[in-house]
Amino acid sequence: KGHLAPYASVDFNYKSSAETFAMSNIALQNSGLNRKAWRSLENHIRNWTHEKGRLVVVTGPIFNKLPKKVKHISVPSAFYKVIYAPKHKRFLGFVFPNTDISARQIWDYAMPVEAVEKQTGYTFYSSLSRRKQAHKTSTDPEWWKRRDIA
């Protein structure tokens, strides 16, 4: 299983931290994905909050039309994370298949938020102006990898 919002990232107060253990925050996630690529991305996101300022992160599962089930519980075919750095007007998206993926491979799954929207059917950050939303069509992994952003 995997937590969609990790306990280590939700430290606003006791109630918020405790809510990370609610069933609504848990999905059946491949253990190799959870311990490797997913954990690596979560660590990057925590570091980015120090390097790039406040981030707005949306996470969720993606299900096939006829999902595999384990004990009557649907297993996601993939998981997504979309990230917005408001101070810099930068967006980044990821979709990981629900399989074993190494931490070194996370950038192979980076994509524009617009591509994540197409895969999920969701519109992310819809309250932003059209001008800001226009940035969802591109991504710059090298910018996110840099550590000198303030």
Model-inferred region functions:
Residues K1-A150:
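Domain-level detector of nuclease and nuclease-like folds
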